Protein backbone atom coordinates (compact mmCIF):
# COMPACT_ATOMS: atom_id res chain seq x y z
CA UNK A 1 0.00 0.00 0.00
CA UNK A 2 1.25 3.48 -0.88
CA UNK A 3 2.26 5.99 1.80
CA UNK A 4 -0.69 8.28 1.06
CA UNK A 5 -3.19 5.42 1.27
CA UNK A 6 -1.78 4.24 4.61
CA UNK A 7 -2.11 7.74 6.04
CA UNK A 8 -5.63 8.15 4.67
CA UNK A 9 -6.79 4.88 6.26
CA UNK A 10 -5.08 5.76 9.53
CA UNK A 11 -6.77 9.15 9.69
CA UNK A 12 -10.17 7.50 9.18
CA UNK A 13 -9.42 4.95 11.90
CA UNK A 14 -8.29 7.60 14.39
CA UNK A 15 -11.25 9.88 13.71
CA UNK A 16 -13.68 7.02 14.30
CA UNK A 17 -11.89 5.73 17.40
CA UNK A 18 -11.67 9.16 19.05
CA UNK A 19 -15.07 10.51 18.02
CA UNK A 20 -16.23 10.68 21.66
CA UNK A 21 -12.86 11.56 23.22
CA UNK A 22 -12.31 14.27 25.84
CA UNK A 23 -11.77 17.63 24.16
CA UNK A 24 -8.07 17.94 24.88
CA UNK A 25 -7.29 14.49 23.50
CA UNK A 26 -9.68 14.35 20.53
CA UNK A 27 -9.12 14.25 16.77
CA UNK A 28 -8.30 17.95 16.68
CA UNK A 29 -5.45 17.42 19.15
CA UNK A 30 -4.19 14.59 16.95
CA UNK A 31 -4.44 16.75 13.85
CA UNK A 32 -2.42 19.55 15.45
CA UNK A 33 0.28 17.12 16.60
CA UNK A 34 0.32 15.55 13.13
CA UNK A 35 0.83 18.94 11.50
CA UNK A 36 3.47 19.93 14.07
CA UNK A 37 5.33 16.68 13.45
CA UNK A 38 5.34 17.14 9.68
CA UNK A 39 6.60 20.70 10.12
CA UNK A 40 9.45 19.61 12.40
CA UNK A 41 10.33 16.63 10.18
CA UNK A 42 10.98 18.95 7.23
CA UNK A 43 14.33 19.87 8.79
CA UNK A 44 15.22 16.39 10.08
CA UNK A 45 16.45 13.27 8.28
CA UNK A 46 13.65 11.08 9.62
CA UNK A 47 11.41 8.30 8.31
CA UNK A 48 8.35 10.35 7.45
CA UNK A 49 5.96 7.38 7.43
CA UNK A 50 6.95 6.47 10.99
CA UNK A 51 6.64 10.11 12.10
CA UNK A 52 3.20 10.55 10.55
CA UNK A 53 1.78 7.25 11.80
CA UNK A 54 3.15 7.73 15.31
CA UNK A 55 1.73 11.25 15.47
CA UNK A 56 -1.67 10.02 14.33
CA UNK A 57 -1.74 7.05 16.72
CA UNK A 58 0.07 8.42 19.78
CA UNK A 59 -3.15 8.99 21.78
CA UNK A 60 -5.29 6.24 20.29
CA UNK A 61 -5.87 4.93 23.83
CA UNK A 62 -4.38 7.41 26.29
CA UNK A 63 -3.71 5.65 29.63
CA UNK A 64 -5.41 8.56 31.47
CA UNK A 65 -8.71 7.39 30.04
CA UNK A 66 -8.00 3.65 30.24
CA UNK A 67 -7.44 3.08 33.96
CA UNK A 68 -3.73 3.83 33.60
CA UNK A 69 -3.16 0.86 31.26
CA UNK A 70 -0.14 1.78 29.12
CA UNK A 71 -0.40 -1.30 26.88
CA UNK A 72 -3.77 -0.67 25.24
CA UNK A 73 -2.53 2.12 22.96
CA UNK A 74 0.47 0.26 21.50
CA UNK A 75 -1.63 -2.91 21.13
CA UNK A 76 -4.52 -1.14 19.39
CA UNK A 77 -2.10 0.66 17.06
CA UNK A 78 -0.37 -2.61 16.17
CA UNK A 79 -3.65 -4.39 15.45
CA UNK A 80 -4.76 -1.63 13.12
CA UNK A 81 -1.41 -1.30 11.33
CA UNK A 82 -1.22 -5.07 10.89
CA UNK A 83 -4.68 -5.02 9.34
CA UNK A 84 -3.53 -2.66 6.58
CA UNK A 85 -0.25 -4.47 5.93
CA UNK A 86 2.31 -2.12 7.46
CA UNK A 87 5.80 -3.59 7.81
CA UNK A 88 6.29 -5.30 11.22
CA UNK A 89 9.50 -3.36 11.94
CA UNK A 90 7.66 -0.08 11.42
CA UNK A 91 4.85 -1.27 13.69
CA UNK A 92 7.29 -2.11 16.49
CA UNK A 93 8.94 1.29 16.12
CA UNK A 94 5.57 3.05 16.37
CA UNK A 95 4.59 0.97 19.41
CA UNK A 96 7.79 2.05 21.15
CA UNK A 97 7.15 5.70 20.33
CA UNK A 98 3.62 5.49 21.75
CA UNK A 99 4.87 3.72 24.86
CA UNK A 100 7.81 5.99 25.71
CA UNK A 101 7.08 9.49 24.36
CA UNK A 102 4.88 10.82 27.16
CA UNK A 103 5.96 13.42 29.70
CA UNK A 104 5.49 10.98 32.57
CA UNK A 105 7.95 8.58 30.93
CA UNK A 106 10.64 11.23 31.33
CA UNK A 107 10.76 10.40 35.05
CA UNK A 108 12.24 6.98 34.21
CA UNK A 109 15.65 6.20 32.73
CA UNK A 110 15.22 6.14 28.93
CA UNK A 111 14.83 2.65 27.48
CA UNK A 112 14.06 3.70 23.91
CA UNK A 113 14.75 6.69 21.72
CA UNK A 114 14.82 7.52 18.02
CA UNK A 115 14.81 10.65 15.91
CA UNK A 116 11.23 9.87 14.92
CA UNK A 117 10.17 9.66 18.56
CA UNK A 118 11.93 12.93 19.33
CA UNK A 119 10.01 14.65 16.53
CA UNK A 120 6.62 13.33 17.62
CA UNK A 121 7.44 14.06 21.25
CA UNK A 122 8.24 17.68 20.36
CA UNK A 123 5.07 17.93 18.29
CA UNK A 124 2.94 16.65 21.16
CA UNK A 125 4.65 18.86 23.73
CA UNK A 126 4.03 21.93 21.59
CA UNK A 127 0.30 21.22 21.80
CA UNK A 128 0.60 21.30 25.60
CA UNK A 129 2.02 24.83 25.46
CA UNK A 130 0.83 28.28 24.43
CA UNK A 131 -2.81 29.24 23.96
CA UNK A 132 -3.84 25.72 22.97
CA UNK A 133 -1.98 24.21 25.91
CA UNK A 134 -3.71 26.56 28.34
CA UNK A 135 -7.11 25.68 26.90
CA UNK A 136 -6.36 21.96 27.06
CA UNK A 137 -5.11 22.18 30.65
CA UNK A 138 -8.28 23.84 31.92
CA UNK A 139 -10.46 21.55 29.82
CA UNK A 140 -8.86 18.46 31.38
CA UNK A 141 -8.93 19.99 34.86
CA UNK A 142 -12.65 20.62 34.48
CA UNK A 143 -13.14 17.10 33.15
CA UNK A 144 -11.49 15.76 36.34
CA UNK A 145 -13.34 18.19 38.63
CA UNK A 146 -10.19 19.99 39.75
CA UNK A 147 -9.99 23.51 41.12
CA UNK A 148 -8.71 26.25 38.83
CA UNK A 149 -6.49 27.75 41.52
CA UNK A 150 -5.99 27.39 45.25
CA UNK A 151 -3.24 29.58 46.75
CA UNK A 152 -3.02 27.20 49.71
CA UNK A 153 -1.97 24.29 47.50
CA UNK A 154 1.56 24.86 46.25
CA UNK A 155 3.03 23.27 43.11
CA UNK A 156 5.17 20.20 43.70
CA UNK A 157 8.41 19.15 42.06
CA UNK A 158 7.44 15.58 41.18
CA UNK A 159 10.37 13.19 41.21
CA UNK A 160 8.68 10.02 39.95
CA UNK A 161 6.00 8.93 37.52
CA UNK A 162 3.52 7.72 40.12
CA UNK A 163 3.51 11.01 42.02
CA UNK A 164 2.93 12.91 38.79
CA UNK A 165 0.14 10.55 37.63
CA UNK A 166 -1.65 10.64 40.99
CA UNK A 167 -1.64 14.41 41.40
CA UNK A 168 -5.06 16.04 41.86
CA UNK A 169 -3.73 19.58 42.26
CA UNK A 170 -5.45 22.68 40.83
CA UNK A 171 -4.88 23.34 37.15
CA UNK A 172 -2.68 26.39 37.73
CA UNK A 173 -0.22 24.09 39.51
CA UNK A 174 0.04 22.07 36.29
CA UNK A 175 1.80 25.00 34.66
CA UNK A 176 4.66 24.69 37.15
CA UNK A 177 4.62 20.90 37.36
CA UNK A 178 4.67 20.32 33.58
CA UNK A 179 3.83 23.05 31.08
CA UNK A 180 6.59 25.52 31.95
CA UNK A 181 9.14 22.68 32.03
CA UNK A 182 8.54 21.59 28.45
CA UNK A 183 10.64 24.31 26.79
CA UNK A 184 13.82 22.78 28.18
CA UNK A 185 12.83 19.25 27.23
CA UNK A 186 12.52 19.81 23.48
CA UNK A 187 14.68 17.68 21.20
CA UNK A 188 14.88 19.46 17.83
CA UNK A 189 15.90 22.97 16.79
CA UNK A 190 12.48 23.62 15.27
CA UNK A 191 10.79 22.32 18.39
CA UNK A 192 12.93 24.54 20.61
CA UNK A 193 12.16 27.63 18.56
CA UNK A 194 8.41 27.06 18.54
CA UNK A 195 8.41 26.09 22.21
CA UNK A 196 10.05 29.37 23.22
CA UNK A 197 7.23 31.36 21.63
CA UNK A 198 4.56 29.33 23.37
CA UNK A 199 6.43 29.37 26.67
CA UNK A 200 6.57 33.16 26.58
CA UNK A 201 2.82 33.33 25.98
CA UNK A 202 2.15 31.16 29.04
CA UNK A 203 4.24 33.50 31.19
CA UNK A 204 2.20 36.47 29.96
CA UNK A 205 -1.00 34.56 30.70
CA UNK A 206 0.08 33.70 34.25
CA UNK A 207 1.08 37.30 34.93
CA UNK A 208 -2.38 38.47 33.86
CA UNK A 209 -4.05 35.65 35.82
CA UNK A 210 -2.42 36.73 39.09
CA UNK A 211 -3.10 40.41 38.38
CA UNK A 212 -6.81 39.61 38.08
CA UNK A 213 -6.74 37.42 41.20
CA UNK A 214 -5.14 40.04 43.41
CA UNK A 215 -5.91 43.45 41.89
Labelled PLM ranges:
Residues 1-15:
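Short alpha-helical hairpin
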Residues 2, 18-27, 31-44, 57, ...:
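Divalent metal-dependent phosphate-bond-processing catalytic cores, especially two-metal-ion Mg2+/Mn2+ enzymes
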Residues 27-34, 52, 91-102, 203:
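Short, well-structured alpha-helical segments
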Residues 33, 69-83:
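An active-site-proximal "capping" alpha-helix that borders the catalytic cofactor pocket
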Residues 48-65, 73, 94-104:
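His-Asp-centered metal-binding catalytic motifs of divalent-metal-dependent phosphohydrolases/nucleases
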Residues 66-70, 131-132:
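Conserved strand-to-helix beginnings and helix N-cap segments that scaffold or border functional pockets
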Residues 85-121:
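Hydrophobic, well-structured mid-protein blocks that either form specific transmembrane helices
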Amino acid sequence: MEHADIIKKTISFVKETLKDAEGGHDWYHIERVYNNAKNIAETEDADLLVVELAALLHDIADPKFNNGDENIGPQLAAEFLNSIGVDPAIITHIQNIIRYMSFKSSFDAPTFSSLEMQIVQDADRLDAMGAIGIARAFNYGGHKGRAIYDPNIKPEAHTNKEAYKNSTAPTINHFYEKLLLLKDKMNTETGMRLAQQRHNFMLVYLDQFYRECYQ
